[in-house]
Design a protein with these regions (language model features):
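A charge-rich, low-complexity, intrinsically flexible signal that marks solvent-exposed coils, linkers
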Residues: 1-88
Length: 88
């Protein structure tokens, strides 16, 4: 799994459209192998990012859980601690 794609479901506040778009861009980059597409692939690359973002939003909005929403600040602190432990 691409480490740059973060879990977006069940957070308070909910995932923004920008966060979903960023995750969609990372996903399409991973699948295509392109960080920046050539002119020949630019249109389909961009359309694919938009399509993935639409489906991702539908998924996130449709999922249900009984779990309490995660707090973004607490999760960010945990991520920083893991990074510090991992990289020193």
């Amino acid at each position: 799994m691409c480490r740059n794609i973060k879990t977006l479901f069940n957070f308070e506040p909910p995932a923004s459209d920008d966060e979903i778009k960023s995750a969609s861009l990372q996903f399409v980059r991973k699948l295509s192998g392109f960080h920046t597409p050539s002119k020949a692939n630019e249109e389909i690359f961009s359309q694919s990012v938009d399509d993935v973002a639409i489906i991702a939003r539908k998924l996130i909005d449709s999922l249900v859980t009984n779990a309490e929403p995660h707090n973004r600040e607490i999760e960010a602190q945990r991520a920083r601690l893991r990074a510090q432990q991992r990289f020193g």
